[in-house]
Amino acid sequence: MNVYRCPVCGYLQLGEKDFHFCPVCKTPAESFYRDPTMERSANWDTKSRMMIQHMAKTGHYFLEGKGTTRQFLNMDDLLFMPGQIATPPLLDDIPVKAEVVLGKNSPQAILLKTPILNAGMSFGALSREAKIALAKASRMVGGIANTGEGGMLDEEREFAEKITLQYASGRFGADESRLTQADMIEIKISQGAKPGMGGKLPGKKVTEEIARIRQIPSGKMAESPSRHKDIETPEDLSKKIAWLREITGGKPISLKFVGGHLEKDLDAIFSQANIPDVLVIDGGEGGTGAAPVFTKDHVGLPLVYSLPTVADYLRKNGLREKVTLIATGGIRHSGDVAKAIALGAEAVYMAGALKIAMGCKYIRECHLGTCPYGIATQDTRLRKRLDVENAAQRIANFIRAATDEVKTIARICGKNDIHKLNKDDLRAINSELARVTGVETASGGVE
């Protein structure tokens, strides 16, 4: 079997060169070269050997930035069925709605102009400049910024019209005064890159400013536990939701979790007196500033398996009018956004795509703090390389263009609202994908 190597990130493609881009760093397939040395030992790829050598030398697991490099089943083999005769496409001048409501029954509901929202990326993992650019871009497009688990920068609150404060297990910068400044609170149970694990920010990255925002000592490692210590039962979660609603005056409360024992987890969440206004399902493809490769590659369900299950649960239990569903984890472009919506999401979180829009070249050095583009670093010399205004404009341009593309897909399908897209508008050209999503195959029927 032939093995082709990406010259940029080292990804190995087994088989023929029947693809267009590297699934990891998006290098064109034409740049891949055949690697005969790997053809003799395809199972022992460079990354596996490198991880073994690292573990043997240090006695610790191998950390890496971004998401998994594994190729999980994704939405690429779902295709939209264009309207033709029976259901014609809409004319170009017919407007298509794309607004999203967070907190449908909340006294402080949030109306957004785009379904493409900022995922949680913390100050510490990202530079101050990157965080400000994301906040400014969210205002430009009528979206909502997200603090991530590292607390809220004053400038984030200043420049973002709407902002979500992430309430994670470390509770960094999440005292009552900050909670009341946010427009939505997101209880982070877990994330796709490292579900069931806490986080560690090395002491050398805990600058005085980061320490002030996170409300921790400077120069010392910032650690968050594997779970919320005061949320041990579904009842505890219900009480936490009620408390957060009370202190914020009824602002929307979001809950973020990863695909695992989905039905049991959903029953545990929605059998309680207090339920979230927004539910975020994160796929195992989700990226992060630093995570062990073994969790990224082997723990947590990919989004395409989780999203349809969660969406069907909400529909069957009459929760669609109460809960807004957000999908995240490896969402790359408008095709992914539109397909996620057709599978039941009302909005998506993007992280990697927004960093690429502002200048990230995906070299996977996020965890080292040496990002040469000034995005995932606290090095003052490197941070100067990121032009905040230009980065904000580029992010906004991308979100606007991608939102327009999603609207166009809806128009092609004869829909005047992106939220009218559904499984009937899709066909699968992969039988496994048809089976897990409930979408008909292109040849007819659900596998």
Segments the model singles out, each with a brief description of its role:
Residues R5, F21, T370:
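The −1 position to Zn-ligating cysteines in a subset of zinc-ribbon hairpins
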Residues L112-L117, P195, I213-S226, E246-G249, ...:
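Gly-rich Lys/Arg/Thr-decorated short loops/hinges at beta-loop-alpha junctions or inter-strand turns
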Residues C25-R34:
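Short Cys/His-rich micro-motifs in 6-15 aa windows
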Residues N2, D18, H367:
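Short metal-coordination and nucleic-acid-contact micro-motifs, chiefly zinc-binding Cys/His arrays
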Residues L14-F21:
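Short linker/helix segments within small regulatory modules
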Residues Y33-I116, G120-R139, G143-I144, G151-M152, ...:
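Conserved, well-structured core domains of diverse proteins
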Residues H228-R383:
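Glycine-rich phosphate/ribose-binding loops and adjacent secondary-structure elements
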